[in-house]
């Protein structure tokens, strides 16, 4: 189990993930992990103020669109938007919680570049566990660059076979982290 937020939470990660805080400064409300493998995944866990469920989608969809805005994404599509069951975040069973999940893709320019030809398609998986008693959304996102996908796919089934293993790895990673996430010290929300 990997300690998060000074040990206030912990979660299980697949092998080969590096804590990005050893490379650069990370905001206090975030934990960022980079994968050292061919999939090149990034996992971000954020503690954010709880938002009310939007009328036009899930809390996870709201955060997906917020990520698209932060990424200055030129295109975005949501493939799946669903609720999470208690089994999906079983490490939080002792907490009053709800969850939602989004899978999608964004076309993102490389940082500092404005040339649309330098844009990359990134599959983005977002799971949100809302801790009602603490008015907090725990936002878990996995970013998976799709190097062989030339346009934003309208569905996960339209991703080329050469990028399917990346999508599978991203899905397995977010499920593993979300399912294993445990709140150890509730004072993190004080």
From Swiss-Prot:
GO biological process terms on file: cell division; poly(A)+ mRNA export from nucleus; protein import into nucleus
An annotated Gene Ontology molecular function: small GTPase binding
Keywords: Cell cycle, Cell division, Mitosis, mRNA transport, Nucleus, Protein transport, Transport
Main subcellular location of this protein, as a coarse class: nucleus
Xref: InterPro entries: Mog1, Mog1/PsbP_a/b/a-sand
Annotated localization: Nucleus
Annotated GO CC locations: cytoplasm; cytosol; nucleus
Function: Involved in the Ran-GTPase system for nuclear protein import and poly(A)+ mRNA export. Required for mitosis-to-interphase transition.
Family per similarity comment: Belongs to the MOG1 family.
Name under which the protein is recorded: Nuclear import protein mog1
Organism: Schizosaccharomyces pombe (strain 972 / ATCC 24843) (Fission yeast)
Classification of source organism: Eukaryota, Fungi, Dikarya, Ascomycota, Taphrinomycotina
């Amino acid at each position: 189990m990997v300690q998060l937020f000074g040990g206030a939470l912990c979660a299980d990660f697949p092998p080969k993930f590096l804590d990005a805080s050893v490379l650069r400064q990370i905001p206090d409300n975030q934990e960022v992990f980079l994968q050292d493998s061919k999939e090149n995944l990034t996992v971000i866990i954020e503690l954010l103020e709880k938002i009310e469920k939007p009328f036009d989608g899930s809390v996870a969809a709201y955060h997906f669109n917020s990520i698209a805005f932060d990424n200055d994404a030129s295109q975005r599509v949501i493939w799946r938007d669903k609720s999470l069951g208690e089994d999906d975040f079983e490490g939080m069973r002792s907490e009053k919680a709800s969850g939602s999940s989004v899978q999608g893709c964004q076309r993102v320019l490389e940082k500092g570049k404005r040339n649309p030809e330098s844009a990359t398609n990134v599959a983005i998986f977002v799971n949100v566990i809302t801790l009602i008693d603490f008015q907090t959304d725990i936002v878990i996102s996995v970013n998976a660059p799709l190097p062989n996908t030339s346009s934003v796919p309208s569905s996960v089934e339209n991703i080329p076979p050469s990028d399917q293993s990346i999508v599978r790895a991203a899905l397995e990673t977010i499920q593993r982290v979300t399912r294993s996430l445990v709140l150890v010290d509730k004072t993190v929300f004080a």
